[in-house]
Amino acid sequence: MMEEYVVIGKVLDTFGLEGELKVRPYAPPEVFENLEKVYLKRKGGDWVPFEVEWVDFIDDKVIIKFKGYDSIDEVEQFKGAKLFLPKEELPELGEEEYYAYELVGMEVETDKGKKLGKVERVQDMGPYDALVLDKENLLVPFVSDIVLKVDKENKKIIVKEELLPV
């Protein structure tokens, strides 16, 4: 059986002069805290492992240093790349934490019972993530003021109707 990989972040830019990378995390901090290896996908489809030398956190970004990449010139090639982990290596999350892949396919409805559609994907909007729904490409900000409940068991997300951008 083929391993399933999950995106955990995206390289935004280089950081410093010694091969560090600034990453926008798509996963909670605990995924990065003990990170030993990440995977990037080659254009041909092969998964390439990279050993992680160290990880640091600055504001809402993650700084990662790969072993053996010690200059800015060596890591320029990674700008824009997505970082992956095999699904089975992801740590268990807390009660109110979710990986983006877990939300895909969930039904979204309002607290008044109106069905809005299924989550097609989770889109990075900068300061927050948004749920892209299959009906009319509706975007629902994935923020605590709007998302009232995520029911993993019943694959349902309840959102506050009066705060929706519709």
From Swiss-Prot:
One annotated Gene Ontology cellular component of this protein: cytosol
Xref: Pfam families: PRC_RimM, RimM
Domain PRC barrel span(s) in chain numbering: 95-164
InterPro entries tied to this protein: PRC_barrel-like_sf, PRC_RimM, RimM, RimM_N, RimM_N_sf, Transl_B-barrel_sf
Alphabetical UniProt keywords: Chaperone, Cytoplasm, Ribosome biogenesis, rRNA processing
Subcellular location(s) of the protein: Cytoplasm
Major location (coarse): cytoplasm
Family annotation (Gene3D superfamilies): PRC-barrel domain (2.30.30.240), RimM (2.40.30.60)
Alphabetized SUPFAM superfamilies for the sequence: PRC-barrel domain, Translation proteins
Any GO MF annotation of the entry: ribosome binding
Alphabetical GO biological process terms: maturation of SSU-rRNA
Tagged with keyword Cytoplasm: yes
Protein family membership: Belongs to the RimM family.
Domain notes: The PRC barrel domain binds ribosomal protein uS19.
NCBIfam families xref list: 16S_RimM
Assembly notes: Binds ribosomal protein uS19.
Function: An accessory protein needed during the final step in the assembly of 30S ribosomal subunit, possibly for assembly of the head region. Essential for efficient processing of 16S rRNA. May be needed both before and after RbfA during the maturation of 16S rRNA. It has affinity for free ribosomal 30S subunits but not for 70S ribosomes.
The protein's name in its UniProt record: Ribosome maturation factor RimM
Organism of origin: Aquifex aeolicus (strain VF5)
Gene: rimM
